[in-house]
Amino acid sequence: MKFTTAAVLSALVSAEIAFAAPGGNGFARRQARRQARAAGLKASPFRQVNAKEATVESNWGGAILIGSDFDTVSATANVPSASGGSSAAGTAWVGIDGDTCQTAILQTGFDWYGDGTYDAWYEWYPEVSDDFSGITISEGDSIQMSVTATSDTSGSATLENLTTGQKVSKSFSNESSGSLCRTNAEFIIEDFEECNSNGSDCEFVPFASFSPAVEFTDCSVTSDGESVSLDDAQITQVIINNQDVTDCSVSGTTVSCSYV
């Protein structure tokens, strides 16, 4: 499991801002989440702490590669069912940076909520995340996620529902909010945070139990155009109240995370 340094952790704790948690039900709640994101809610970089007072000691579960010049990260993941009530949530995504480098994250993925609703989203952290339009996600769907960094400040995020055939993409160009280091590549299950509009008050959402296990299959990473093996990936778990709530592992080109 990867541990952040004290300096990185200090910077992270002061900047813990994430995309919105659920509000009401159905369309109105999804609209509220979109409005909340527009108000300034963001995804969180990797957080790992040992403080006794911390409720969520690790907010990422999955696989992290540390290297250089990462260009692309892609995988296909199944959409699980979730429980835990309308306020409970979780997310699955692929991305570049956010662990040892936290100046920016290029990422895309999908959220699940305890009432059976789902979102598809993209983000260039520290800018706000946003929902994709033109794509729907349902339990059991197969979602292909990919991000491409063409430079430290430009790239793209693409999401395709292989079950329905819907495909959406977002391009980023000359992003001034933060530059990628391109030193991390990730396949992640996350317990994300809900913050107010200016990011001054953040809380982790209740982490929704999910089943079956989320499997990132056909995981692919390239560095300067060359394929990178997952053999050296570091495994992390979501840890809440000193308990692992995910069981993540890597086998070949598959990253599997189950709820425990």
From Swiss-Prot:
Keyword Hydrolase: yes
Example GO molecular function: aspartic-type endopeptidase activity
Catalytic center residues: 190 (proton acceptor)
Signal peptide extent: 1-20
Disulfide bonds: 101-181, 195-219, 248-257
Keyword Transport recorded: no
Pfam families: Peptidase_A4 (PF01828)
Any one biological process term the GO annotation gives: proteolysis
Site (Transition state stabilizer): 107
Keywords from the named record: Aspartyl protease, Disulfide bond, Hydrolase, Protease, Signal, Zymogen
Coiled-coil portions: none
EC numbers on record: 3.4.23.32
Family from the record: Belongs to the peptidase G1 family.
Subunit structure as annotated in this protein's UniProt entry: Monomer.
Record-given protein name: Scytalidopepsin B
Species in which this protein is naturally found: Scytalidium lignicola
